[in-house]
Every structure is written in structure tokens, then in C-alpha cells.
Amino acid sequence: MNLHEYQAKQLFEHYGLPVKNGAVCQSVEDVDLVLAQLSGDKWAAKCQVHAGGRGKAGGVKLVQDVEEARAFAEKWLGQRLVTFQTDKLGQPVNQIYFEETCDIDKEFYLSAVVDRASQKVMFIASPAGGMNIEEVAQNSLHLLHKVEIDPLFGGLPYQGRELAFKLGLSGTQNKQFTDIFMGLSRLFLEKDLSLVEVNPLVLTKQGYLVCLDAKISVDDNALFRHKDLLALQDLTQNDAREAEAEKFQLNYVALEGDIGCMVNGAGLAMGTMDIVKLYGGKPANFLDVGGGATKERVAEAFKIILTDPSVKVILVNIFGGIVRCDLIAEGVIAAVNEVGVRVPVVVRLEGTNAEMGRQILAQSDVNILTAQSLQQAAELAVNAAKGEH
């Protein structure tokens, strides 16, 4: 689950991390009231969406007066911001965050992620922060400095000092950076985060370090013990189909192809998408119905897939381990009849009662293409998407 910048900065402040004063508005009429809470005569105006690349897309602007702030809010509130991290539709802008400015001397980058290879938390720092950090990550790896922290012990001061030295910080600035490092480490571990990013972390001309931007992602699997964070969830930022899938415990991710995929198991789902690509097709989605797939969940999965107008064929790939393939076959037939599927459906069943499941499909009056192997299923689906079935 992602948080907005203003929400992340509230957490930063709670953990003693240095941020500038800011306030959120949700309507143009609120702009004057919001700016009255802030000092200075110019402010940073930032569209609040769950995506990076806002600055390059025009979603961040330094406004010089109240009139310019109103104009920015009027331009963006209720609109959709498209960045290199969103799809072509972008994400809705429902809030503008206004923040006091500072005199920037230098920009750094600092983040923490879960490193699954080492089973630790990886802190990454760079002296080249700002809007072009993606290019730095691709072309200037020597500018990325890393340190691993053990989740049992958390970050240690010497690790913060080590990163600070590599960034060229010394004296009081080294201590400031170490304090920020320790605060982020506590925040990351105590709130079960999967990502925290400060870009840029700036050094002001007055010699202070400030977290000028903040990005936080929370581990969805830990939300049951963080009701305070769950309350911050903004469902308007989610794909509508993904939000609907969550209600039925379906794992759905929208993609940009035309072959709808319904699979049980995340690994099998990824393998299915790979083989569809191998045969020249493009998956329209990732959809994992889970190990305990039922008729009802299969029907809901069909409904969600078919809300995508790009879908030309649905590929159902089920391995019967926990579930029985004959029950899945009955569920597919019932779902096709209930939902009124108008596109070709390719079904591949393997595992428990697979042969029985294939017989049920063959004896039904529903137009379903049955595959004997995953390769055949992919080939049938790709051909059907091309209109060759």
C-alpha cells in the first residue's frame, strides 16, 4: 500500500525527521486558507498521486504568489496526472500539497528497501539526488552507495556515518545525516515498510539537511497490525479492477495486452504470462485466483477480466493441487453462462481430476477450447486473439 507524500511526511515528523511545513488542499477555495498556515511568500505546489516522475510531468511547481497557487490548483484538481510510472490514463489528482520552500545548496538521494537476496533491509544513498536519479541508477552505479541493516538490530550509528562520509558530509552534517538514517531505520522496521525514499534529501545553504520529498510503501501483509496506516489508504489511486479484485481476495494487476489470464498461484501466473509472450501474445492482466479457488471466485474473476475492453480471449490455466480440476471445470462453465462471456475461452487443466475436468468441459454446451498442455494453451490463446480460432 502506497502513501501520499503529505501522509509520509506526517510519519517522518513523528519520527523526528526534518521536513518543511506543509498543508493539503482539496479544492481551489481552500488554497487561501491553506497558504495562511504557511510562512513565506512562495511555496512548492505538488500534485498528490501514487507515482513518481511528477516534476517532469508538470505536477510540481514553485508558485510565486497566492494567485499562481490558485491557478495551479484549478489546473490540476480533478484531473489526471500522467507520468512515466503511470499508465496512459494517469492517476487522479484529488489533493494539492503546498510546502514552504528552502534555499537548496545540494541534493542527495536516500532510500531503504527489502533486499530479499540478503534477507535484510538495504539502504541506498547517492550524492546525485533529484529528478534524474533513474538515469544515475542506470548509468552511474559508482554513485550509489549501499549498506545492509539486520532487521533484528536495526540501523546502527556507524552505518549512518559510513554513508554520510561517502556522500561527502562531515561535522554537524554527518551527525544530521546519521540521525536521519537512524530515524528512517526505526520507521521502516516499526511500520513494516517495503520502501521508504527521500528524493531529494537536500542540504540547505544554511547547512541543514531536509527531507524535501517522501515516498512510503507499506507491506500489505502487515496491514492487519497497522490500522492507523490502513486508514490512510486512498483507493482512488488504485485501478478500479484491482480494487474490485481485492474484495474477493483475488490478486489482479492490469496490463496492456489483449489476452486475459486466470491462473491459480502467483508463480504459475507469471509463467503463463511468459509463455504467452513467447508465443507472440500480450497478457492483459495478472490474475491469481489463489489455491482455494471456488466457483464464486472464478465467476468474479471472469467479470473483472471482462471489464477490460481490450480483452479478446481468456486463458484459464489451473493446476489442481489443493483444488480439484472437475470442480474448476464446473465453475468455469457456470461462470461463462452467468457472466455471458462473448470472447473465446481457452482452458488448460492439470493435476487432481484433470481428465475428469476436461471431460466435463468437452461434454458441456459451452464454447470452450480445451488444451492438453501449457504450450498448446498459449498457442490457442494467441491465435484466438488474432482471430484465428
From Swiss-Prot:
Keyword Metal-binding: yes
UniProt-recorded Gene Ontology molecular function terms: ATP binding; magnesium ion binding; succinate-CoA ligase (ADP-forming) activity; succinate-CoA ligase (GDP-forming) activity
Keywords: ATP-binding, Ligase, Magnesium, Metal-binding, Nucleotide-binding, Tricarboxylic acid cycle
A Pfam family hit: ATP-grasp_2
Cofactor comment text: Binds 1 Mg(2+) ion per subunit.
Annotated EC: 6.2.1.5
Transmembrane residue ranges: none
Binding site for ATP: K46, G53, R54, G55, E99, C102, E107
Reaction(s) this enzyme catalyzes, per UniProt: succinate + ATP + CoA = succinyl-CoA + ADP + phosphate; GTP + succinate + CoA = succinyl-CoA + GDP + phosphate
PROSITE patterns with a match to the protein in the record: SUCCINYL_COA_LIG_3
Alphabetical list of SUPFAM superfamilies matching this protein: Glutathione synthetase ATP-binding domain-like, Succinyl-CoA synthetase domains
GO cellular component, one term: succinate-CoA ligase complex
HAMAP family listed in its UniProt record: Succ_CoA_beta
Subunit structure: Heterotetramer of two alpha and two beta subunits.
Function according to Swiss-Prot or TrEMBL: Succinyl-CoA synthetase functions in the citric acid cycle (TCA), coupling the hydrolysis of succinyl-CoA to the synthesis of either ATP or GTP and thus represents the only step of substrate-level phosphorylation in the TCA. The beta subunit provides nucleotide specificity of the enzyme and binds the substrate succinate, while the binding sites for coenzyme A and phosphate are found in the alpha subunit.
Protein name in UniProt: Succinate--CoA ligase [ADP-forming] subunit beta
Gene name for this UniProt entry: sucC
